[in-house]
């Protein structure tokens, strides 16, 4: 999406007038050859936009001409501009010409040969490089660009009948990864299935506590489902992740392209014990992207609803729901005035309040996102900052020597030893002095974050209104399992095997400790607050970790450092919502009746990752992730991790090291 506040001169490179986005078409005289080429490129984009094309999402003739104009330009601006559009040529789909547009059809009929066909000028899927021969005239065709298969004009029975729906694919299956010195591109496709949720209704549901000491929760369940791409294992195969963490010192996502295509809407017909699934060529599915984050967040880290790791697994989309209020503060007990005031402020979000597409069988849609986030650093510190010195050189620093309650020992000052020089750098913050409140099965954390309005009636204690602040160790060494990140590899409702417990990363800027002296000994400081000169590294992620988390919208905040190592973003990718269209059917008593339908199709997700290869002066070999650290399992205990057994069961990792964490291999010089 374009920026809310566009700068008058655009976001151009320093010293340039046209080399960059969002600048006006007339911004003065170009400063050099690269700027002149950028001005011509902007004018070509303007013509494409006026003709109904979107040149920003697709590689086009103007981009190719810009690259050709700068092929002999070695200025800094020319190199940056040419490199950007070469990357776009490598990863973006091509904007088709008239001849190619005629090849794309949607068939809106069944076996009737005279049924009406409608055209769709969408580009071909994938990130194939556009050849010179394919970059031809890109003026708009006589038909409307991006036209969808429309209703009406179809003959024959709807919902299958004797014939079946016939159509041309709106995209192929994409997969695999590409590794370069500067970028890594991951491409994945999954078959998904979405069904009718909640009988097309919104409902307020009370989620009962799992224990007497737990919390109840109020939830608004909706008729919508959604796509969640927020996990590294959804995009990187184990081998790709091994290569990424072995060869690159840091990486971060830069752009994501999602395509939902080859939609097939089916009607479920039950006749006694028999069930028939017929094509429904007139039914629709609602799809839109919440790019402005106007609705409550759905992609919470560590949820099970992410895109499946295995390409052949069907992705059954989860139902969307959200929490409108802290239930304990809105129970209206004893006509409490505070709770009544809170209850009267409860919001109600209906997703139908947004514009969105309604697609039919055979149609497709696409979404593009840009990331603005920090790097994931993959280097480990082999020493702490306090040892960044030469131990062979004497120091001018001196220290005071206490007589230690011995009157015969005089107080004195002595020169500090060359190998024990003091440091200016302190450990990072963290909290380790608390424990979970029992019983053992309670839904609590060692620390609880709660909102407690004055005079509100609270029966369940802090566990009923708070959220577990977990794990709260910050950068400190965890003292027990209550301060370690743990997760299950198996889905909810199955046996709880595959429990992963994080280990120490062996990096000297993690798992730190601060000790306080008291004349005779040193005691551990369990709670360390924020001070100047604190130095620490981000929590080491694994392939099983989430990629991002959304920063809450607030007026103030301190240093943002999620405890699981995820990338905190102000604007992460917007949630893509989807639901089945409601098709009413007549009934004798005007009951709320509708067709029973579901939708399946393909969804592809392509992410461009910015990377930096490692370079080192270290003479010795370094540790790398290999297969020798994996396990053996399966039905007959014969199959290695990341393989399948005779029953088709996928052998998942059982330890933290098997998940190939970062910050365990490449040494960095502080």
UniProtKB/Swiss-Prot annotation:
Residues 147-162 have a biased composition (Gly residues). It comes from the Viruses. The keyword Cell wall biogenesis/degradation does not apply. One of its GO terms (molecular function) is phospholipase A2 activity. Transmembrane segments: none annotated. Keywords: Capsid protein, Host cytoplasm, Host nucleus, Hydrolase, Lipid degradation, Lipid metabolism, T=1 icosahedral capsid protein, Virion. Residues 11-66 are annotated as: Phospholipase A2-like. It holds the Pfam family Parvo_coat. One of its GO terms (cellular component) is host cell cytoplasm. Belongs to the parvoviridae capsid protein family. The N-terminus of Isoform Minor capsid protein VP1, VP1u, contains a phospholipase A2-like region. VP1u may play a role in the disruption of host tight junctions in the airway tract. Capsid proteins self-assembles to form an icosahedral capsid with a T=1 symmetry, about 26 nm in diameter, and consisting of 60 copies of three size variants of the capsid proteins, VP1, and VP3, which differ by the presence of an N-terminal extension in the minor protein VP1. The capsid has a channel at the 5-fold axis and there are densities extending the 5-fold axis into the interior of the capsid. The capsid encapsulates the genomic ssDNA. This is Minor capsid protein VP1. It comes from Human bocavirus 4 (HBoV4).
